[in-house]
Amino acid sequence: MNMLMVMLVNITLSSCLIMIAFWLPQLNLYTEKANPYECGFDPMSSARLPFSMKFFLVAITFFLFDLEIALLLPLPWAIQMYNINTMMLTAFILVSVLALGLAYEWMQKGLEWTE
């Protein structure tokens, strides 16, 4: 019952915050909101620079593998648990899913930097 209550509160709070985040930006619509701030002067050029999609994919891949290391770091301490099979299976599934994702991105040539 306690876990159900915690999950219900978390889901409710998350839903409320997401709805507020989508609702609030629609209140203040004016043209100067999209312009960059340059000490009160009119902007000299566009502040919107094109963003490389290849860089974005490499950055996301780096972030995912960094997260994988953070999740697998406590694995040596988990060996002391009584149910080691469950922990090892979970770690194996995590590494397998990330390896499959890396193989897919590699086959789709998402990691090649040259265009």
From Swiss-Prot:
UniProt xrefs under PANTHER family: NADH-UBIQUINONE OXIDOREDUCTASE CHAIN 3
EC number annotated for this UniProt entry: 7.1.1.2
Protein name: NADH-ubiquinone oxidoreductase chain 3
Key word Translocase present: yes
Keywords: Electron transport, Membrane, Mitochondrion, Mitochondrion inner membrane, NAD, Respiratory chain, Translocase, Transmembrane, Transmembrane helix, Transport, Ubiquinone
Domain of life (superkingdom): Eukaryota
Record membrane topology: Multi-pass membrane protein
Purpose: Core subunit of the mitochondrial membrane respiratory chain NADH dehydrogenase (Complex I) which catalyzes electron transfer from NADH through the respiratory chain, using ubiquinone as an electron acceptor. Essential for the catalytic activity of complex I.
Subunit structure: Core subunit of respiratory chain NADH dehydrogenase (Complex I) which is composed of 45 different subunits. Interacts with TMEM186. Interacts with TMEM242.
Primary location class: mitochondrion
Bilayer-spanning residue ranges: 4-24, 55-75, 87-107
Catalytically driven reaction(s): a ubiquinone + NADH + 5 H(+)(in) = a ubiquinol + NAD(+) + 4 H(+)(out)
A GO-annotated cellular component: mitochondrial inner membrane
GO BP terms in the entry: mitochondrial electron transport, NADH to ubiquinone
Alphabetized InterPro entries for the sequence: NADH_UbQ/plastoQ_OxRdtase_su3 (IPR000440), NDAH_ubi_oxred_su3_sf (IPR038430)
Annotated compartments: Mitochondrion inner membrane
Family: Belongs to the complex I subunit 3 family.
GO molecular function terms noted in the UniProt entry: NADH dehydrogenase (ubiquinone) activity
